[in-house]
């Protein structure tokens, strides 16, 4: 079987008309280079680095930050902002795109592990030592993006 044709980088958008589209550093595997999810979402503000959107009962957020030199600290800060923005909401799902996910940090820790440490610290700060009960489904997808 032939592999799918790729062209450029996949771009994700909550709504085709909201102007929030952003490249995620993944190859395009279909004819559509822009993936619109929650196509009815409308912008409803900002919180820290997050742009926020509403689609019916759903609160959606998107943040894009350069990882900097300390990925654990950056992910802890960003997840802290996410948890602040989502206070009073039940988090159902979080998607993360982590550049060079299997590469090592300057301290020798794999990017994914550093990202996960920061994420866990943010949840523990908000929910305490029993934070695992509050963690939603999540994914960390490796990508070629530099931020």
Predicted feature residues:
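Short, polar/acidic, helix-capping and beta-turn segments at strand->helix junctions
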Residues: 1-147
């Amino acid at each position: 079987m032939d592999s799918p044709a790729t062209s450029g980088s996949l771009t994700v958008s909550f709504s085709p008309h909201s102007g929030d589209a952003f490249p995620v550093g993944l190859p395009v595997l279909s004819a559509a280079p822009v993936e619109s999810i929650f196509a009815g979402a409308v912008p409803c503000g900002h919180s820290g680095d997050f742009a926020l959107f509403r689609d019916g009962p759903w609160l959606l957020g998107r943040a894009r930050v350069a990882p900097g030199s300390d990925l654990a600290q950056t992910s802890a800060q960003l997840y802290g902002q996410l948890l602040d923005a989502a206070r009073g909401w039940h988090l159902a799902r979080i998607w993360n795109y982590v550049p060079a996910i299997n590469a090592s940090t300057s301290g020798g820790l794999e990017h994914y592990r550093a990202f996960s440490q920061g994420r866990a610290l943010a949840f523990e700060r908000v929910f305490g030592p029993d934070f695992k009960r509050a963690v939603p489904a999540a994914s960390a997808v490796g990508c070629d993006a530099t931020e």
